[in-house]
Amino acid sequence: TLKPPGRVSTGNGADDDEEVEDLSGLPEIPIGGPGVYPIHAASGVGYGLGLAGNAHRHAPDGWLPSVKYFVEELGEDVNARDYNGYAPLHNAAARGDVELINYLVEMGADVTVLTRKGETTADMANGPVQRVTVFPAVVQLLESLGSKINHNCVSC
């Protein structure tokens, strides 16, 4: 695991009533504004949040072709951010999808982006919530590409 000694598991990292500082630098989403874009759905939105668990990680040959379609045919931005600040690369990292990570990076994805909670792409591969698999090889890949890791593994 990549959890440093003595780290206490705190679930989602904040109490429900506690305001979390937005570290992403993104503008606030207006009420009724966009939540997620199609490219987020195609890359696995929700997996790293534990909203889908392992249910949709294994879509045989479904992730890369879908994302390629949105990027190459429809011109979707590989760095598009959803309402929580997650980019498609965060979603691919949370699922341990090396093939999609490599494609997104090749197409210009920024591996250094932060979510509104300050999560990096490497953090997403490192078990950001309980019951989400840790992918050590993906963490190493993302770190080698320039992503930082906060060592906040909740699954460890």
Annotate each PLM feature.
Residues 1-5, 65-77, 102-110, 140-148:
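Ankyrin repeat domain, specifically the short helix-to-loop turn at the C-terminus of the second helix
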Residues 7-9, 45-49, 77, 99, ...:
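Alpha-solenoid repeat scaffolds
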